[in-house]
């Protein structure tokens, strides 16, 4: 969220609103149109029969709030900016919109979806393929850390949708392995991360190569003003579906903190929790890759079965670890913020922030794992003296109260 807070200060949610007004000024109403139609069921949305079959087979019964308002405008071909918290079915919203509009008789890339991490791109690929199963959709994920030749071979054979990370997608466009001629839909997922300084230039480069008349969808959990500002350059009369600040409360997830006197005592606190609680699956977040390795080693020496994943590991190793965690053969995953957005594990009941995130907005991506699609979850934050300011910032940012962990925590899981 660079540029929102003065250097050296913590993020203040009030600056978000002031900055957005300043950026958009009096043109705000002209640039955005709010979209307020609500559909209480998937059947009422006018979707293809085989898409509905895929949606129900995937396990959806009733559309979430973002799906009730977000699927239809995308299906109508409108440019859309949609904001909803992590775990609310955002991915299925744009996947449904894409799948509804594809011409399946034309085996050419018609939709391009960009995501900030390999894990998230692969997760989107899985959702797109599952929802489009009865439609015969061909989807491919172009991500770094995989074979360029294999990407070229699959793209040459023909796909309807490409999901990928900006670097590899731009490489495929540059090599002309991915031909943009038939692309009519362009989606940015996790736009807050995508449009951060690291990816902005690559996204511009990709956008320049796409056909001029293209539908653009921007989907994100948080929507910093710089993301809104940049979308002005890409989008034509977009409709906006933004969650009001007061609504971003991560409903259904109970949030607690534990005061820990010293950093060195966090390990004892963690082990005590695992000895007293019956936990099905949990994710533990720390702030550095080195700490992932350190904590994994310490937990294993105390006979706790844990898995670990971070950005220094090669893609194949990370895939194997995530597969084990999804299948339940590993119950505890230790990781960093880098991979928070790619973890989609339905049975996660507990998220532990061993370290509080360094940015308030990352808190959402971390604990949004623990109560996906209405499943209840618990988030526990370890807080040392130096963290008190950040805990206060997080509570103000999301308009939530995080209470001290009660003695009867076992009853909550």
Curated annotation (Swiss-Prot):
EC number(s) given by UniProt: 3.6.4.13
Protein name per UniProt: Eukaryotic initiation factor 4A-7
Pfam families in the record: DEAD, Helicase_C
Domain of life: Eukaryota
Residues engaged in binding ATP: 84-91
Annotated keywords: ATP-binding, Helicase, Hydrolase, Initiation factor, Nucleotide-binding, Protein biosynthesis, RNA-binding
Family annotation (InterPro entries): DEAD/DEAH_box_helicase_dom, Helicase_ATP-bd, Helicase_C-like, P-loop_NTPase, RNA-helicase_DEAD-box_CS, RNA_helicase_DEAD_Q_motif
Motif, Q motif: chain positions: 40-68
Gene3D superfamilies documented for this protein: P-loop containing nucleotide triphosphate hydrolases
Organism in which the protein naturally occurs: Nicotiana tabacum
Coiled-coil blocks: none
SMART domains (alphabetical): DEXDc, HELICc
Family assignment from sequence similarity: Belongs to the DEAD box helicase family. eIF4A subfamily.
């Amino acid at each position: 969220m660079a540029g929102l807070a003065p250097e050296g200060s913590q993020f203040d949610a009030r600056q978000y609103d002031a900055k957005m007004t300043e950026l958009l000024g009096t043109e705000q109403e002209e640039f955005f149109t709010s979209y307020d139609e609500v559909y209480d069921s998937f059947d009422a949305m006018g979707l293809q029969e085989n898409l509905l079959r895929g949606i129900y087979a995937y396990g959806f019964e009733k559309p979430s709030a973002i799906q009730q308002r977000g699927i239809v405008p995308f299906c109508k071909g409108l440019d859309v900016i949609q904001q909803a918290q992590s775990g609310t079915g955002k991915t299925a919203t744009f996947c449904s919109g894409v799948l509804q509009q594809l011409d399946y008789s034309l085996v050419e890339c018609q939709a391009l979806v960009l995501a900030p991490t390999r894990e998230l791109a692969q997760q989107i690929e899985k959702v797109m393929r599952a929802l489009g199963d009865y439609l015969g959709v061909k989807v491919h994920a172009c991500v770094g850390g995989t074979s360029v030749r294999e990407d070229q071979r699959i793209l040459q054979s023909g796909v309807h949708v490409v999901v990928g990370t900006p670097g590899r997608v731009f490489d495929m466009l540059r090599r002309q392995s991915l031909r943009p001629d038939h692309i009519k839909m362009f989606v940015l997922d996790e736009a807050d991360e995508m449009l951060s300084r690291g990816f902005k230039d690559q996204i511009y480069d990709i956008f320049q190569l796409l056909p001029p008349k293209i539908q653009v969808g921007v989907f994100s959990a948080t929507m910093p003003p710089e993301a809104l500002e940049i979308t002005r350059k890409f989008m034509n009369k977009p409709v906006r579906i933004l969650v009001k600040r007061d609504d971003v409360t991560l409903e259904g997830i109970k949030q607690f903190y534990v005061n820990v006197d010293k950093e060195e005592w966090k390990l004892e606190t963690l082990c005590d929790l695992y000895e007293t609680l019956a936990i099905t699956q949990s994710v533990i977040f720390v702030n550095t890759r080195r700490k992932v390795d350190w904590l994994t080693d310490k937990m294993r020496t105390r006979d706790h079965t844990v898995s670990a994943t971070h950005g220094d590991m090669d893609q194949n190793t990370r895939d194997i670890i995530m597969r084990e965690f999804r299948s339940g053969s590993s119950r505890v995953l230790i990781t960093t913020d880098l991979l928070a957005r790619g973890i989609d594990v339905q049975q996660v009941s507990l998220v532990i922030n061993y370290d509080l995130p360094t940015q308030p907005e990352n808190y959402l991506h971390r604990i949004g794992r623990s109560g996906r699609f209405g499943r209840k979850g618990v988030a526990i934050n370890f807080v040392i003296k130096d963290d008190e300011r950040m805990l206060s910032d997080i509570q103000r940012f999301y308009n939530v109260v995080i209470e001290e962990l009660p003695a009867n925590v076992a009853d909550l899981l």
